[in-house]
Structure formats: structure tokens, C-alpha cells
Amino acid sequence: MADIYFVGLGLSKRFLTNASLEVLKGSDVIYADIYTSISCDINEKTLREITGKEIIPATREVLETKEKEIYKLLDSGKNVAIAVVGDPMIATTHVSLATGARARGHRVSVIPGVSVHCYMISRSMLSSYKFGKSVTVTFPVLDKLDYTPYRVIKTNRELGLHTMVYLDLKETGIMTADLALNYLKKMESDIGDKVILDDDLVVIGERLGCADERVRAMKVVDALNQKFGAPPHIIIVPSRNLYEMEVEGLKCLS
């Protein structure tokens, strides 16, 4: 019997917890999924430096194809860590690997990390109880937009809820907040249900957890013409029915 750990690295080195670092240093093999989410200062090199161990880079897709290899390491008595930027089980789900390891008699542990989801809610000062389903704006495929984000925001609006909007991340490019809003405006133009209007508020986070992070509240029309810093970015589309304290909180971000 061996241990497999799913380790949250947080958003940057200053959010890497002692618990996570202790587990990484005590593991025999470390796979690092540092591609599904981006950090300003956590990469293979920094992980090698802080753990003193070799790091095996792996995307989520690579981990899925290497499940048998990981199980083989566990079966041989090696303790394995899967290190993930942010939190290991919120945005990037490795449940299949965890349940497979447990079925083979190995111990499974999750070491949570500071996730972009929780961080952005806290920085926005919006009520955490009023968040509905989250959604991702993706790059068009063969010039076709996926209208799921528009539908999710519409449903959340009808329920008086906020929407956390993640932005697509691919090897070919990282989506920025202004591009995502342009896609949402295109969806609005195509569907016309008045879900994304120029005067609607959005909260935009840039490089969360990093020294140069910014979180700002602004109208959609202003965001479309805004020059944002380097990614990663994330967007909250607030409910149109804000509590008085939420309104006051958003003033701190303008």
C-alpha cells in the first residue's frame, strides 16, 4: 500500500502552504499539472528548487493517459504527488485517478490550496451565497462559438445570482478578459435576450495572487475598451439585484 497525494500549490509561491510543501518533499515521485492553470511564479524550475526533487511535467490529458503508469508506481510502494496550481479538486478534477488508486488499495489524500474561485469571490466582496453555476468562455472551434456561457449567465441572472466566468487556456493562446467579453457581446447580438448589456457591471481579476494583481469593477462597455495586463484573467458577471453592502463593496474596486 502506498500514498497518492493531490496537492494544491495555491496561486503563487506566497500562497504555497507548509502542508503542501511538506507532502511534496516527502513524496517519491511528483507530477506537476502546471499547465491547466497559470501561475506567475510556480513552474517546474521553482518546484525543483523548493522541493529538491525531480518534477515530471504533466497536463491533465497526460495524467489521464498515464494512469496505469502511476498505479504501477503506487503498487511498487512509491508515494506519488500530483501537484496542481490552485486547488487540486476544484477547477482541475483528478477524481478518476483518486478513485482508481483507492480501488487498488492505496491511500488517497487531498491537500487543498488557494483556488482562483475562492480568491476571486473574496476579492470581489460579493456575497458567496449568491454565486450560481460557473462557466468557461472558450475559443471558437472552426469559427463557431459555444453559446453555453450566455445561457448559464442568463439562468443565473433569472435566479438573481452572480456568475464566475473562467477564460479558455490552450497551448495556442490564453484568452483575455476583453476578448471574452467581445465573444459574450457577439452571443448577445446573435440571441438578443439582453443578458450582456453595455451598462452591466463586470468584475475583472488580473494575475490573481501575484504581486501585480488587479481586481476592478467596471461597465461592460468600458471593459471592452480597456487595456488589461498580462493573463491569466477571470470575470465575475454580478447579479443585477445586488445587496446594498455588495454595491458598497464594488465601489472599492472601481
From Swiss-Prot:
Stored Gene3D superfamilies:
Cobalt-precorrin-4 Transmethylase, Domain 1, Methyltransferase, Cobalt-precorrin-4 Transmethylase, Domain 2
Which pathway does this polypeptide act in? Protein modification; peptidyl-diphthamide biosynthesis
Keywords on this record?
A: Methyltransferase, S-adenosyl-L-methionine, Transferase
Respond yes or no to whether keyword Methyltransferase is given for this record: yes
| SUPFAM superfamilies attached to this UniProt entry | Tetrapyrrole methylase
Catalyzed reactions per annotation:
2-[(3S)-amino-3-carboxypropyl]-L-histidyl-[translation elongation factor 2] + 3 S-adenosyl-L-methionine = diphthine-[translation elongation factor 2] + 3 S-adenosyl-L-homocysteine + 3 H(+)
User: Where along the chain is S-adenosyl-L-methionine bound?
Assistant: 11, 87, 90, 115-116, 167, 208, 233
A single Gene Ontology biological process assigned to it is: methylation
Name the top EC class.
transferase
Q: Which domain of life is it from?
A: Archaea
User: Pfam families given for it?
Assistant: TP_methylase (PF00590)
- The EC number on file is 2.1.1.98
Keyword Membrane (UniProt): no
Q: Which GO terms describe its molecular function?
A: diphthine synthase activity
Q: What is the stated purpose of this protein?
A: S-adenosyl-L-methionine-dependent methyltransferase that catalyzes the trimethylation of the amino group of the modified target histidine residue in translation elongation factor 2 (EF-2), to form an intermediate called diphthine. The three successive methylation reactions represent the second step of diphthamide biosynthesis.
Under HAMAP family, the record lists:
Diphthine_synth
Which family does this protein fall into?
Belongs to the diphthine synthase family.
Q: How does it assemble?
A: Homodimer.
State what protein this is by name. Diphthine synthase
Organism listed in the record: Metallosphaera sedula (strain ATCC 51363 / DSM 5348 / JCM 9185 / NBRC 15509 / TH2)
